[in-house]
């Protein structure tokens, strides 16, 4: 059967830029899936998604004009029950009637268990045109659109008004109606650069015709790559680099159909403003690409992406420079105004900034952060007074003009203003870095003082918000407690502090009775669960479970333990020792009395005496290895007792009739379990 390329295009008004690429990919994938289900393509559909500000399109290769004929077998009642005394039963008659057949047309087939009556027929394949309308409509319905709209007198809804529909199979129009539009082969190109209506001659020529006649680069990926290449080329010419921002590149790609990269500039005096402010206003407000010199310093040149190509782009450049000048003047004004007051003098204003109505203002929060940060700094061997000072000033920039305009700069502006106020560089850096890590993969605070304030900030948030009942559920986590927990855990894996003790310190910083009394234990459990999720990114689940079963309170040696268990798991003896450990734990659960020391005089059989001797020899070796942090050695020592463990379980009845002997054997196993589980619960390996 011959096949041809299928093209579908929805011509719209300007689509939401931040959603464009996602819409294009979803639309294309849904159409391809519909064609696969309808068996209009063989195997997986080969398709290309197109998305530009005014269109969503998909091009699918090797689409059939007609479905292949299908042999259908409808199975009915069992032969044994379908005929009684030579007469068809009601079940058989009903099956034939429902299948639209006569009884004499039925055949007998085997369904894998028994012979059954069946009706076999050939279903003629339906033409593409009879199936495509529903496929497109379903693809439109499945689009991830949070808000839809109506337009004109239409009763149809979509993310933006739709004004044109192309459906081409090869060079032929497939007649369908979607969103109240009849399909055709006409579309529009660039709003200003195109000559008008474009007739798409063939589904395969779409991209080339849109580029040549329409001045539209229809492929989102193609436009993005072209913009990226042009930006990098312009930057190299200026001996600069583009300030990286993938989200901005995606957004700009979604704003233009015919991208043209232009160079522009601004007055040097604006560079006196912290470059983070200038970069943010250029990227966020104007969608420009700032340029950095070889030292990473902002230059007074920038790149912009225009949707127009003209012989003289100077008027476009001047217009953009004029708009940016106003924005940068605002930033300069905010910066100068903020310098009229020190961070310390701003602290009283934090009393009017509500953190949460149940746990007070930011001013009250600062008091808690100071005490927690000082405590952590002492534990880290850092300057507690410096940590307390950094915590005191950490939130002062929230009431500055600059942070009021650009909340993303909180912490960063605090650093700059702290420097201007004469605070030490260590305190200034800690003010900025106390928000780190902000997200998975973000860098950690660089100094112990910064880490102390960062831990204090996240612990106070986690314990306080949890303590008033605002616990994360499902995908709802408005106070980002999961992110706070992740940040705490990553820092504690670097610093050897007791996580439970820190949680208690944070809890004690709140007024007595304000938080739920179960908060410390509940947040500790929450942290343990988040730790498992974090570690499972790099280690198998059973290894993580084995290490965390010991409920470690210090996390700085976790990586070493995980790596040691991973090596142990590869030993030939590992599986048998894990099984033996599980058996030991099950036996210990049956102990009637408190477990204690082994009484050598009650050891009766050679196997238990040998195991006791092996355990005696093992004890100092494992203790020394664990004390030195050499967990791999500690675990590898276990392999030496496998013969004694095997012999013990083969020849000794642990639950002996003599109560004293039974208790002594359980004491021996308890001692062995302590050695086997010194690093991790190896019984969990392989589960």
Swiss-Prot record:
Q: Where in the cell is it found?
A: Cytoplasm
Ribosomal protein in keyword set: no
> What GO molecular function annotations does the UniProt record carry, in alphabetical order?
arginine-tRNA ligase activity; ATP binding; glycine-tRNA ligase activity
A GO BP entry: arginyl-tRNA aminoacylation
Gene Ontology cellular-component terms listed = cytosol
Reaction catalysis annotation? tRNA(Gly) + glycine + ATP = glycyl-tRNA(Gly) + AMP + diphosphate
Known EC number = 6.1.1.14
Which domain of life does this protein belong to? Bacteria
Write down the Pfam families for this protein, in alphabetical order. Answer: DALR_1, tRNA_synt_2f
User: Which keywords has UniProt assigned to this entry?
Assistant: Aminoacyl-tRNA synthetase, ATP-binding, Cytoplasm, Ligase, Nucleotide-binding, Protein biosynthesis
Coiled-coil stretches are: none
| InterPro entries per record | DALR_anticod-bd (IPR008909), Gly-tRNA-synth_bsu (IPR015944), Gly-tRNA-synth_heterodimer (IPR006194)
Q: How does it assemble?
A: Tetramer of two alpha and two beta subunits.
Classification via NCBIfam families: glyS
Annotated family: Belongs to the class-II aminoacyl-tRNA synthetase family.
Protein name according to UniProt: Glycine--tRNA ligase beta subunit
Q: Which organism is it from?
A: Neisseria gonorrhoeae (strain ATCC 700825 / FA 1090)
